[in-house]
Amino acid sequence: WGAFLVSIPFLIVIVTGILLQLKKEVEWIQPKTEEVAIDTLSIRFSDILSISQGILEAQIQGWSDIDRLDVRPDKGIVKVRAKNKWEIQIDLERGTVLKTAYRRSDIIEQLHDGSWFHPSAKLWIFLPTGIIILILWLSGMYLFFVPILAKRSRKS
């Protein structure tokens, strides 16, 4: 019964886990991070906001529409992640937009841990699923190795 109870949540975890493993390889999942050579980080936060407001897909009116800024000085960029899941990559020296793309990896991560369905699903469905799968795996390993170990002990 354990396998039957966890089959759907486990399938979701497997599929989304595979997608998350590929997020750096497949640009459809997560936009590739651009790199630029820079001498100085010369743009200000106010510049980042005004540049981001010019990207219509991101629907940014003010700071409240921005989920986070991911500053990468070693790559010379800042990633602006809008609350509507659009990502804007901006050159930190010249302030030019290097890339805009929809970021699906966040939704896939929420599906993977169950929080997309409901905040409680993470702890009340997906955590027990993981525990049941661990128990099933341990019992499967036990059933696999016990006959092998029994044969070895009979031979000696």
Protein language model regions, located:
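Conserved histidines in hydrophobic membrane contexts and catalytic metal-binding motifs
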Residues: 1-156
